[in-house]
């Protein structure tokens, strides 16, 4: 079954053959497009058998997620070649009183260290000056989402 032949449903799962299966009703906006609405998310995986969660700046390019994070902690090296989860949400909208529906998306798939082209670096925007008091040194990962989970809170 090709992508074009899939039933109109929403949560996406890439099958082992590389096809994409949908398992929930489709929304007006695909989950990966929701990432364009917020600049930061959280990357989760394990390092030396212990789980960790770290903040990362993201952009979406060609259906993949590019992440920029601080290299000083070595998190990018722990993720390289591993399956990771990357999540983002608009839950701060509730705290700021913007109202509307809230959403959270999580993408799971393999990550690899990459070197973005100049245009991709510009899309990331300004980098932080420091992280925990040390100068920010960027590292970049690309996540190829194989599984997608989306949750919404409707008000």
Roles of regions detected by a PLM:
Residues 83-84, 124:
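Conserved short secondary-structure elements within globular domains
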Residues 2-14, 21-22, 89-155:
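Charged, gly/pro-rich active-site loop segments
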Residues 16-42:
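Short, basic/aromatic recognition patches
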Residues 73-75:
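Short, surface-exposed beta-strand-loop junctions and turns on beta-sheet-rich folds
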Residues 38-70, 86:
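Short beta-strand segments
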Residues 14-18, 59-60:
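Short, basic, glycine/proline-bearing loop/turn elements
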Residues 38, 53, 60-62, 79-83, ...:
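Short connector loops at helix/strand junctions that flank enzyme active sites
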